[in-house]
Amino acid sequence: MEKQIEDRIFKIAFKKLKSSVYYDKTQLILRNDIVRYEQNSKDKIDSKLESLCTQFNDDNKFEKLKELIKRSISISAFPKKLIKSQTPGVIINKQTSQTTVNQNQYFIDMCVEGHILGVVWLMTIGYKLDKLVYEKSYGNRIRKKLINELSDEPTFSPYLFEPYFMQYESWRDTALDEAKKYLHQKNDVMILTMDLKRYFYSVDVTQNAFDKMLEDAGIDKSDKAKCGLVKLN
């Protein structure tokens, strides 16, 4: 029999989703969707999350939920970079008839239920994959205290990821400290930085590669008695 996910996991996931969006200034659309998700319901939010959990655990209801989420998915594009004016150094208050966008920033537009399931995935599967990531990789790392070490269950803390600014400072300071160490040894040092531009728009993870990651993390998709999370993948 497939192991089911308890409704409290969905409640924790929603709390973490709200916290993550609150601190992310780029997620204005999702922030507004969450407000509507809480307001446009006759039931209390706990009852709504319990209902979502029931839909997830019931195979027949889950198929309808999956279709609902898939139909809700679209892409929102916002200007990231504009083409610069051809008259550098000249400031005028005349409005141009058209602004040319050089690059867009894309965001997934999806129903709140889909985002909640995404956080449930992070709490039950994603954190195991995160443990396999190179320790000096700092971007979007899952909180080390996301899972209680004693109970092996997600904590009720609202935080999901390590704060990016702290991760960035660690990346920067570690590199500079290493360079100073060699300078004190009278060695020459050169610091190079590289940026993989628009990485998330171009990366293509195949199903085989993803299955290999799950295997490396000790997640057996075929063992439903121990892993009732197959649906999340």
Question: What label would you give each PLM region?
Answer:
Residues 101-139, 233:
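Conserved pre-motif C helix in the palm subdomain of viral-like polymerases
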Residues 82, 112-114, 195-200:
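Short, flexible loop/turn elements at secondary-structure junctions
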Residues 84-87, 95-105, 168-184:
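Short linear interaction motifs
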Residues 132-165, 227:
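Short, glycine/acidic-rich hinge or "gate" loops at secondary-structure transitions
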Residues 151-191:
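Hydrophobic, well-ordered secondary-structure segments
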Residues 98-110, 141-152, 156, 194:
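Short acidic, glycine/Ser/Thr-rich loop/turn "cap" segments at secondary-structure junctions
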Residues 176-233:
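Conserved polymerase palm-domain catalytic core
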Residues 1-97, 101:
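Non-catalytic, polymerase-adjacent accessory regions of viral genome-replication enzymes
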